[in-house]
UniProtKB/Swiss-Prot annotation:
The active site is at residue 273. It comes from Mycobacterium ulcerans (strain Agy99). InterPro entries: PEP_carboxykin_GTP_CS, PEP_carboxykinase_C, PEP_carboxykinase_GTP, PEP_carboxykinase_GTP_C, PEP_carboxykinase_GTP_N, PEP_carboxykinase_N. The gene is pckG. This is Phosphoenolpyruvate carboxykinase [GTP]. Disulfide bonds: none annotated. Substrate binds at residues 81, 220-222, 271, 387-389. Its cofactor is Mn(2+).
Amino acid sequence: MTSATIPGLDTAPTNHQGLLSWVQEVAELTQPDRVVFADGSDEEFHRLSAQLVDAGTFTRLNDEKFPNSYLALSDPSDVARVESRTFICSEREIDAGPTNNWMNPSEMRTLMTDLYRGCMRGRTMYVVPFCMGPLGAEDPKLGVEITDSEYVVVSMKVMTRMGTAALEKMGQDGFFVKALHSVGAPLEDGQADVPWPCSDTKYITHFPETREIWSYGSGYGGNALLGKKCYSLRIASAMARDEGWLAEHMLILKLISPENKAYYIAAAFPSACGKTNLAMLQPTIPGWRAETLGDDIAWMRFGKDGRLYAVNPEFGFFGVAPGTNWKSNPNAMRTIAAGNTVFTNVALTDDGEVWWEGLEGDPQHLVDWKGNEWYFRETETTAAHPNSRYCTPMSQCPILAPEWDDPQGVPISAILFGGRRKTTVPLVTQARDWQHGVFIGATLGSEQTAAAEGKVGNVRRDPMAMLPFMGYNVGDYVQHWIDIGKNSDESKLPQVFFVNWFRRGEDHRFLWPGFGENSRVMKWIVDRIEHKAGGKTTPIGTVPTVEDLDLEGLDANPADVSEALAVNAQEWREELPLIEEWLQFIGEKLPTGIKDEFDALKERLRDAE
């Protein structure tokens, strides 16, 4: 079929010649049955969702409990980001660095072009214009995803500002990121489709210099919703390096004191370490309130006043379901319960609701994420996949900050880094200065989780929680953070802190209750910013004593809190070789500022008790 005979190509709702020629080129290569330009309307969402129900991809949920919501069950081989198949194809291998997979870009283009040839046969090719961040921004970051997955189109409406408004923003010649996606499952005449098409061959490829994303073979969230990690972190981090800003794997939280003063805090944690829970914090301290601006990604630019301002480029939440419940994150539950949600790989109850491990209730019978019968206390496997997800509109969140759609963003007072560590790392530490804060972030260690392939439980270094998401060399990335500090007024920069909610005692109990009680740590952070709270100087930074924290009304043993705050110099001396191994791995591009910080830490620990 030539492009001239592919229905839909000749009725494009745009005169953008660059877009039109790209769409035609892709259609000629992939050979879809038809081309549809997505408009982002509610009607389109309903129509495609109904189509997915008919295809067996979606199950419509109980409308009384989850209005306009659906459950999708993926192929068991397509359940998470595939870091081993994710590539940064920079022109030079050194620019991808040691943390990324690299292939020569011309070789990768040849290889993937062969995969794309005819790959949409029997399917509809959707052209999905979208904007990351508010449409009213001075420099809106636009993109177009071409995909053969209705699941992607529906999810992109939730996760991005998608459709006609984004297309109009592009005008006739505006720049956009080209994001090409196919599930890699062409259909021959008469061939029946499967509920979750995908391919055993998977590539998620980024070309940072040309700002392109090519994805093949996976229908799963992070591999297929190309506005998310692919654009908002991997491509955007390369843009940010070139343009002097930061694209980071961070939540954005607004804390409001009893005096009604607002503080905006950005926090970077690896996946499944409590980002969404902190983003939707429900403070337990009287008089304190919290609102959310985002749970996953922050773009930070300097304002005219010299402060760092953050926006959330996303439009929805794509949260890990297991462990989310009315105690751990009531605001996430309220957001989901408002409806318009796409669940993936959770379990289905007999009355058309969803369930996952950690959710209240003990259903006796379920259909699990693989579509099999599941019985309480009889079936040995989990009912929901550990990386199962909910995809839900941000606008439904009951504690959404009114500034969430402000193109100017919000001024950041503190940046938090955090990971999941049973030992060594105290509950909260304040960095000595910006460069020390960058060192803390660059050497962040966390026990591995189910959000990516790999062995659960291993501690891996995850700089700024960006290990899987840096679009260029890790050494250059860390140097960019240092340069952000050097090129600004340090008095206006956010204060940097490190938190660890997950420290355990010798009996393996969590020493800190976490969840809403984390507001007590946040209060100390705010009071440090205001120079109102005490703290103890330690070799790793300033750590509060038990007396420095507001523990009034806390149902916890002060001895446990003291242990959670402890800085054990011997444990840290044992940590030094692990940090050094990571710094050696970064290699020749390791910033001298980071080496200086490491040497200074060794010196401070040498004489510490």
